[in-house]
Amino acid sequence: MPKRTDIKSILIIGAGPIVIGQACEFDYSGTQACKALKEEGYRIILVNSNPATIMTDPDLADATYIEPITPEVVAKIIAKERPDAILPTMGGQTALNTALSLRRMGVLERYNVEMIGAKAEAIDKAEDRALFREAMKKIGLDTPGSMFANATEIKDEDRKRHEVKRAEVKAQFSGDELDKALDKLETEWQLGEVERKQRYMSHALAKAAQALDVVGLPAIIRPSFTLGGTGGGIAYNRQEFFEIIERGLDASPTTEVLIEESVLGWKEYEMEVVRDHADNCIIICSIENLDPMGVHTGDSITVAPALTLTDKEYQIMRNASIAVLREIGVETGGSNVQFAINPANGRMIVIEMNPRVSRSSALASKATGFPIAKVAAKLAVGYTLDELDNDITGGATPASFEPSIDYVVTKIPRFAFEKFPGSSPILTTAMKSVGEVMAIGRTFQESLQKALRGLETGLTGFDEIAIPNIEEGDEKNAIRAAIGTPTPDRLRMVAQAMRLGLSVEQVHDASKIDPWFLEQIESIVKTEERIREHGLPQDAENLRMLKAMGFSDARLASLTAKDAEDVAKLRADLDVHPVYKRIDTCAAEFASPTAYMYSTYETPFVGQPRSEAEVSDRKKVVILGGGPNRIGQGIEFDYCCCHAAFALGDADYEAIMVNCNPETVSTDYDTSDRLYFEPLTAEDVLEILRVEKQKGTLHGVIVQFGGQTPLKLANALEKAGIPILGTSPDAIDLAEDRDRFQKLLIKLDLNQPKNGIAYSVEQARLVAADLGFPLVVRPSYVLGGRAMQIIHDERGLQAYLLDTVPELVPEDIKAKYPNDKTGQINTLLGKNPLLFDTYLTEAIEVDVDCLCDGKDSLVAGIMEHIEEAGIHSGDSACLLPVHTLSPEIVAELERQTAALATALHVGGLMNVQFAIKDGEIFILEVNPRASRTVPFVAKTVGTPIAKVAARIMAGESLEAAFDAYGGKPQPTARPHIAVKEAVFPFARFPGVDTLLGPEMRSTGEVMGLDYDYALAFAKAQLGAGVELPREGTVFVSVRDEDKERVLGPVRKLASIGFKVMATGGTQKFLEANGVESTKINKVIEGRPHVEDAIRNRQIHLVFNTTDSASAVSDSKSIRRATLMQKLPYYTTMAGAESAAEAIAALKAGSLEVRPLQDYFRS
């Protein structure tokens, strides 16, 4: 049937900040949904707190709310906008849980809002593990043996009592009085949440103890309604069991966990299914996890299509997944069903299903070309699959055709354990990866090796790796332990085990990885041995065969002790180049006008390999993307790449995107004119450029927008004679090179902190002695502050040089100096020296984003950090416009920024980080490229500055580029205030200290927007998941130099009814200054102490600053306890002051919600 006409406006809920388990894929799905529904004529209302998303661009929805995604805030948006329908299936778990809460609160009923895409009953049935198990039983599908630990009975009683009260209120009041009375009732219900949760936890823990006797150990624990397995895990003993149960019950919004029999080692599969309301069902893609059960699917290496299923098994699984959707009641849209198969006897069980688009949906969309989110959005408003065209084939096929693929797709996750010292790198059912790479090849081997080099962790393929503990004697057991333990490096361990003589059968016994995959890896390992022995083949046929197995030039070079350039020259001499094939959803059955391509060195049985690149004769620009997400390089850079593609299209260039991240909008088939899904290595990029140069004009390549990834390729591109648009590689190098940059600053008469540079361990000690402590030290050429630390004393320096720096040494240098740690470090520092700066205590840090065309420049935004200098800018909360800086300082910052931009001949964007101490300005860092603050600035000032920058890079003047997008912004003319807050994954890494420093650890960000600073800060906190208390007790323990300053926020909180609790010295100071407070013991002073009070929920807010290393160590347990109890915790005075202002503002009146568009209406 055609689309529904009874619906006029639709509210789409986004996913909020990037967190582990919920990343860019929901910007991709949300953006597709917005575009698809807007083109059908619906009024689109969007809520998302993440400014770095394409979906929050003001031209994508009719009303864009950058507001916290909480039920209370979304209820206000519904009251204001009165949408006809709400679509909750595009924003991950966040959107689903919010929609269900709105239904439970009666908001959807009160405002007559229909839930489309998935009914509440279907969401409940899929997400509530007890209901799901019953549903599977009903249709004859097996699930793991399991029991539940929950508090369903007492929850139902509480809910019934609440519903009786609601009915009484409805009978007693009407009109506005009814709305006020219902709001009051809901507020009372919300305030009782903590007490109810504690009762539910106690009840559920008792049930868990009973379940343990039945299920036994090991047991798999899965909380209900959580994201990426949050709170879950595998318990091997009783202590672990109760620790995970408690964590899981706390993480589950419904206080429920499922305790399952162990299915560790079984094979895991996923089916991506789409269904319409006429019951047409299609399988978009089957996905197989290379890692066996026991590892979260988001942390598993996966392949598509499934490669080790027989056709009979596939058909059984296909039918089962469709039956699951029908029974759960998913009437329209995409869903993901996960299965496990016991390889010993073939028993198939259903693990779970997601009644929404998911991470796997994004992977399946990119793997097949089928736009699941777009189709799901259109199905939600009434269309059937056969009424929709397949865009990829240009409408030659309808959307009801199941995709067919004639290639292999491999996804490998990317991890960041090095950012969280003390965290365990063992993978479990709780997701820990921060990003992923996808690669496409004609064979599994080609696809796998492309994915390994696309990870950007320094791998060129199956690089050698040391097996842990192998030198301790029992070699076989060490190898078995290494391949039997799921870690990020397990696949390389498998290859290393084979090099050390283990057979496929032995590796399978230890790892439970399917023998077919192991045989493929063994074939690669044996081929490597032959290359080592015989060298590179000198004929085209045999060299092409190696390339068809996925070997990179760099890997072949390392196997034969040559340079990668030598291998590339040999290939060029023998005319061995890849061809490019199209992803067309139909295995080449129909011609595809969509230029969505991958490279392959296929060797057909007959004739020559055929290229489907079909290069155009247009003027073209190539944009290099950011590769897999990682901490320090995420969605903000993808946002810039997308805006570059849009702007170049506006300027009539052909925009060509190169990227390998399946989660992103940049790898959507309609973001750019042409898309190459390829690893971002010099070899892969130069091959694409070789093909694109064959026709038309290559105007140049943009390396400025994708973070550090494309910048690393700039020199190789320049050497190959490729024009690089915007700022020159030499200027980028000048800003990174300490000596050259220092000379520039001297020439411009600009300050920087006293600093030094060290090319060896000995020199590092001399530089430190010369500068004195405290110091900031970091390796050169890094993004996200990798291995950047504040060093307070000689002991800290020693630990940094002997413990931290060795972790940065690449495998090839380790192999060169196997038993010489100092030799390894000095070799590394010879190329990448350590940079030392005097640490400026009590300084205000400032970020400035500016645009320049080489002559003229414009400062787009000056952001004042709430945290002091010394905390990585990506982890700091910041605000725009500045809050405490004088107009004179602001003018001087603008002058210095303009001087730097002109001196560096910046073409496009530049970011400068300043520190201001006692009125004096110091330059900390200059980045002549896009920074992670670009989207935040663009949304705040109302100008798409990344689009403007792309036009400048293509050759337009600053004036002309701004004129194309409505003229230059007038930041000072806007009365609103924006606050950016970082979001951290600490809850995923038990045991890790949450104290921030110069190494970046946040995964995402949110934005708070208001006309009042305190409310903007409050919104940013709420958006980041920090629930600011309106009443209760504040705990205060601060270092001596902060005691005067803490009086202000503490007095403010005391004046609005907060009680104050403090440790000895702070408590005496507060009392002496007229602030009534209660003394409590520090942890080292004996019990009952502050940590007990936090765990007993007697404390609701924490202000804690530390000075010495011992004080930092002493307060670590307090930081962990506040994290686990989800308490707001502030470790800087600026943060404490802002929090106190925000709490007072919230208590004084309610938050108002406004669409982004309203802030820019004159």
UniProtKB/Swiss-Prot annotation:
Region Carbamoyl phosphate synthetic domain: start-end pairs: 614-1025
Q: What's one GO-annotated cellular component?
A: cytoplasm
Quick one: which residues bind Mg(2+) 3?
Answer: Q913, E925
For region Carboxyphosphate synthetic domain, the annotated ranges are: 1-456
The residues that the entry says bind Mn(2+) 3 are Q913, E925
Q: Which GO terms describe its molecular function?
A: ATP binding; carbamoyl-phosphate synthase (ammonia) activity; carbamoyl-phosphate synthase (glutamine-hydrolyzing) activity; metal ion binding
Q: Where does ATP 2 bind?
A: R778, T838, L840, E845, G870, I871, H872, S873, Q913, E925
Q: Which HAMAP family match?
A: CPSase_L_chain_B (MF_01210_B)
In this chain, the stretch annotated as Oligomerization domain covers 457-613
The answer, when asked if Ligase is one of the entry's keywords, is: yes
Instruction: Detail which positions bind Mg(2+) 1.
Output: Q338, E352
* UniProt-annotated binding residues for ATP 1: R129, R222, G228, G229, E261, V263, E268, G294, V295, H296, Q338, E352
Q: Which residues does Mg(2+) 4 bind?
A: E925, N927
> Which PROSITE patterns does this chain map to?
ATP_GRASP (PS50975), CPSASE_1 (PS00866), CPSASE_2 (PS00867), MGS (PS51855)
Recorded hits in NCBIfam families, A to Z, give: CPSaseII_lrg, PRK05294.1, PRK12815.1
Protein name, as recorded: Carbamoyl phosphate synthase large chain
* UniProt source species: Brucella melitensis biotype 1 (strain ATCC 23456 / CCUG 17765 / NCTC 10094 / 16M)
What positions does the entry give for Mn(2+) 1 binding? Q338, E352
Gene from which the chain derives: carB
Q: Does this entry carry the keyword Zinc?
A: no
Q: Keywords, A to Z?
A: Amino-acid biosynthesis, Arginine biosynthesis, ATP-binding, Ligase, Magnesium, Manganese, Metal-binding, Nucleotide-binding, Pyrimidine biosynthesis, Repeat
Return the InterPro entries for the record.
ATP-grasp, CarbamoylP_synth_lsu, CarbamoylP_synth_lsu_oligo, CarbamoylP_synth_lsu_oligo_sf, CbamoylP_synth_lsu-like_ATP-bd, CbamoylP_synth_lsu_CPSase_dom, MGS-like_dom, MGS-like_dom_sf
